[in-house]
Amino acid sequence: MATKFPKFSQALSQDPTTRRIWYGIATAHDFESHDGMTEENLYQKIFASHFGHLAIIFLWTSGNLFHVAWQGNFEQWILNPLKVKPIAHAIWDPHFGQPALKAFSKGGSAYPVNIAYSGVYHWWYTIGMRTNQDLYTGALFLLVLSAILLFGGWLHLQPKFKPGLSWFKNNESRLNHHLSGLFGVSSLAWTGHLVHVAIPESRGQHVGWDNFTTVLPHPAGLQPFFSGNWSVYAQNPDTAQQLFGTNEGAGTAILTFLGGFHPQSQSLWLTDMAHHHLAIAVVFIVAGHMYRTNWGIGHNLKDILDAHRPPSGRLGAGHRGLFDTITNSLHMQLGLALAALGVITSLVAQHMYAMPPYAFMAKDFTTQASLYTHHQYIAGFLMVGAFAHGAIFFVRDYDPEQNKGNVLARMLEHKEAIISHLSWVTLFLGFHTLGLYVHNDTMIAFGTPEKQILIEPVFAQWIQASSGKALYGFDVLLSSSSNIATQAGSNIWLPGWLEAINSGKNSLFLTIGPGDFLVHHAIALGLHTTALILVKGALDARGSKLMPDKKDFGYSFPCDGPGRGGTCDISAWDAFYLAVFWMLNTIGWVTFYWHWKHITIWQGNATQFNESSTYLMGWFRDYLWLNSSPLINGYNPYGMNNLSVWSWMFLFGHLVWATGFMFLISWRGYWQELIETLAWAHERTPLANLIRWKDKPVAMSIVQARLVGLAHFSVGYVLTYAAFVLASTAGKFG
């Protein structure tokens, strides 16, 4: 008899019901729970999967390059990046009638195409790519790299090339190599690319495989480097009149500290970015030589952590025990990595629009909106994942003996204080923010808008002023010409920065008022509520008032409601599940705020946001309803336009989202009855009953139904808003 799926669990493979399939899928990646799994084998499997992951990423990026080179308009776009719409790829659809063919043939193409809103054209242009041939070469290189990585993954599963457990747990070596190699040397290599290829191309000088060894990136060559006269590399930067991609107004500097933006492309100066990457390379290459490995010099991480015990005794055993706890817990490591990556991804969202690094991207408004929304949602999912694995760490890996009295144990000991403080913060923020919004709504409804409670965000304005924004008249720090801070930077980066922050042509430190004050606190409410649910879920994962140790219940024990007392208190999975709703809710507010504020600024109508954002009906009517008109009119009895696809996606997203509730607001009994009724009918229907199955159909578990509901809710939510952002922005600005 052939062994049934799943091969990794004998118990599951012998289950006579459909539970075998669903639990098999659910635990396929939970390597720890597989039959016969050893710690060494676990690490080896995860290590090999990294290669596969990278191979998929490079295959995908190779596909981006290939399709743009084949079906895009990169070379035409370069000639006029502000007017020509970048094409992602062609659309082939046999269902298209003539009106659709006409509507979707845009960006100067003779056939239906998708417009690229990812910013890749701007990126490739900025880093020195100029022809379709460049794109094809890049695609081929990444394809080969992908194949090499796949081979590497396979190779590291072969007995001779499997790393041992001690190799995976050698923290100092890993830190040295990752800091020096992954961050340091790669940043140095990128600096090299910017200096040798991107900067010359931005000045109209071609550098390619044919001449890169002979073209000097700087007229003085390496002489200033070896003589220590490094400032030569910063002399003669590009002028404010430089035309990007030509030598008109171009200088010769390669490493500068100009500050602000290139006036024509409205992106950061390439020479500033090269300098930045060089600095990062130096810092990280040095950092990667700090930890003790084969030669008895450098830091030992265990010694550092064990020494972290403040003499006052207020942190108990301090960081003692953490070295082994973190080294031996993959969930703890993953939680820390996800949290760090989540923060970085959100920072990318913020910096990508406030300080655009790519030429002309600041003027491609739909791309700006897409990239912000995309990165904020990804940050949200990464953050909830961090806490989910934190909770799994407490259930599976936390050893109370090993961590006696240290900071981890103390977090658990005073978790009631942490949770209750978070709870008070959320209650305060929630009632006060909603109270202000509702008061203002009522005043608007009764025709007395002057009675609204409008609070100026004076502290935030003061912070903006201290960074150099002159508008508010706070004579403080960088907004004061006589301040010592202003004088210290006045001959290097400050002139460019101050010009940029006060120019009104970009998104640096946008002017803020009462509407911003309110939505800031609404977002703070969302962030704190999400944090409260996640923190409680993780801290209570192992033990709570009702259940001193929950280790044997596992992470995904179901919350069964008040009928089975206390089950919700012991379900870490349920905290994660609830937190995802709040995370989506919060990022909804964040992206609504960003998008509405920006489209009013881009349209030269900032007053609309300022006046309508102080009450809820303003958000519903003047942001959501007003901007959904292109979606509602995407196709109608009179035909269609090139926003029709987003209209369809808007409907489809709502449908997926609403489907989620079918799984969220129902219990297992209903599904079991439905399944058995369908199975009964199937078995008695001619022709249909030729198809039979051996597994007895069983309704999904409570946790699985919640997961299916949550997945539909999340996917539908994101799809709906994606369609809204794209159609409402592209409908206004093309």
UniProtKB/Swiss-Prot annotation:
GO terms for molecular function: 4 iron, 4 sulfur cluster binding; chlorophyll binding; electron transfer activity; magnesium ion binding; oxidoreductase activity. [4Fe-4S] cluster binds at residues 559, 568. Chlorophyll a B1 binds at residue 654. InterPro entries: PSI_PsaA/B, PSI_PsaA/B_CS, PSI_PsaA/B_sf, PSI_PsaB. It is found in: Plastid, Chloroplast thylakoid membrane. Gene3D superfamilies: Photosystem I PsaA/PsaB. Phylloquinone binds at residue 671. Keywords: 4Fe-4S, Chlorophyll, Chloroplast, Chromophore, Electron transport, Iron, Iron-sulfur, Magnesium, Membrane, Metal-binding, Oxidoreductase, Photosynthesis, Photosystem I, Plastid, Thylakoid, Transmembrane, Transmembrane helix, Transport. It comes from the Eukaryota. Pfam families: PsaA_PsaB. PsaA and PsaB bind P700, the primary electron donor of photosystem I (PSI), as well as the electron acceptors A0, A1 and FX. PSI is a plastocyanin/cytochrome c6-ferredoxin oxidoreductase, converting photonic excitation into a charge separation, which transfers an electron from the donor P700 chlorophyll pair to the spectroscopically characterized acceptors A0, A1, FX, FA and FB in turn. Oxidized P700 is reduced on the lumenal side of the thylakoid membrane by plastocyanin or cytochrome c6. Belongs to the PsaA/PsaB family. The PsaA/B heterodimer binds the P700 chlorophyll special pair and subsequent electron acceptors. PSI consists of a core antenna complex that captures photons, and an electron transfer chain that converts photonic excitation into a charge separation. The eukaryotic PSI reaction center is composed of at least 11 subunits. PANTHER family: OUTER MEMBRANE PROTEIN, OMPA-RELATED, PHOTOSYSTEM I P700 CHLOROPHYLL A APOPROTEIN A1-RELATED. This is Photosystem I P700 chlorophyll a apoprotein A2. The gene is psaB.
